[in-house]
Curated annotation (Swiss-Prot):
Forms part of the ribosomal stalk, playing a central role in the interaction of the ribosome with GTP-bound translation factors. It comes from Ureaplasma urealyticum serovar 10 (strain ATCC 33699 / Western). Belongs to the universal ribosomal protein uL10 family. Pfam families: Ribosomal_L10 (PF00466). This is Large ribosomal subunit protein uL10. One of its GO terms (molecular function) is large ribosomal subunit rRNA binding.
Amino acid sequence: MANVRPSVVFKQQEVDHMADILKNSKSFIVFEYHGLTAANILALRNVLHSSNSKLFVLKNNITARAFEKAGVTGFEDRLTGPNAIAVAMDDEIAAIKAVNDVAKEFDFVKIKGAYLENKFADTHKIDQLAAIPGREGLYSMLLSCFTAPLRNVLYGLKAVAEQKGE
């Protein structure tokens, strides 16, 4: 190991680090970012950061080796060009939704695929997933379902009270 070049050791550490991140993530999405300005990428990073997601830009060789080490399949022939990986740590849909919104805003951003629940998802599946509201939106929908019957009962009681009061 003493004769190994420092750059090889560094690259192996990068592969190991990325493989650990991928194994511990809820989901991730791979996309080609060629054409995005630094301001666009910074805005995307901020959106991802607010949902406890991260954006990584690595060489395709390192990404492929990290995918192999993490047991990720489906991206073998898709890692060409300048790619970025948005990794979701908490909300499975947050990173996919953020990148899909950027891809709709800028035609030159190409989504290569996503990985969710240990399965590869193509662009059609990604569009379906991006249409699902985020965790907070789903919570608010659930809460409104619980409160709607109670609210209707209260409106009914108020109407009866107003009728008797007249």
